[in-house]
């Protein structure tokens, strides 16, 4: 009886240690440096694009709608057939994922948001602290954060190509010129 109880306590201790280790794994994932900014401005902003993402042997193609009213920037992704893929918001400090479909559960949204903002948001790089450096060569911007090369952005007409060197993934952003208008 005492031996059985001792074995249970050892098992519980191992289980607790494993749970603590696993919960710590999330904090070991790299954070998207260069995303948060204390200079985030309240403004009205709207943009619509078609995105193609190549990540981890997966390929996603979707429409992305960005809309900011005040401090909160919302991003909504729809499949080309209209299915909602994910919805998130960014307030200058945090990315809050509100909804996402199962195949996108592991997509590194902090990096995706950061890279989209560097590529499309007006003057986003200027909102960053001095640890962010941008080197321009021809049509390509190289983004360095804490002296580490993290992102390449190539502008070609209405197409922007992103190459994230940290995660890694590639993204092509094509601007939609026939914008959907909202009436209120």
What are these language model-derived features?
Residues 10-12, 41, 56:
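Short linear interaction motif-like sites in intrinsically disordered regions of transcription factors
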């Amino acid at each position: 009886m005492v031996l059985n109880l001792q074995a249970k306590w050892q098992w519980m201790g191992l289980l607790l240690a494993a749970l603590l280790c696993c919960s710590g794994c999330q904090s070991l994932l790299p954070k998207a440096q260069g995303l948060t900014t204390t200079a985030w401005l309240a403004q009205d902003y709207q943009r619509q694009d078609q995105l193609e993402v190549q990540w981890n042997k997966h390929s996603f193609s979707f429409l992305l709608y960005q809309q900011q009213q005040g401090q909160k920037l919302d991003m909504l992704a729809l499949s080309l057939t209209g299915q909602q893929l994910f919805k998130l918001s960014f307030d200058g400090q945090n990315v809050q994922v509100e909804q996402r479909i199962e195949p996108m559960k592991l997509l590194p949204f902090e990096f995706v948001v950061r890279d989209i903002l560097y590529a499309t948001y007006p003057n986003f790089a200027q909102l960053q602290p001095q640890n962010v450096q941008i080197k321009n060569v021809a049509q390509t911007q190289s983004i360095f954060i804490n002296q580490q090369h993290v992102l390449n952005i190539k502008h070609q007409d209405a197409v922007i190509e992103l190459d994230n060197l940290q995660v890694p993934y590639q993204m092509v952003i094509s601007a939609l010129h026939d914008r959907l208008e909202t009436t209120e």
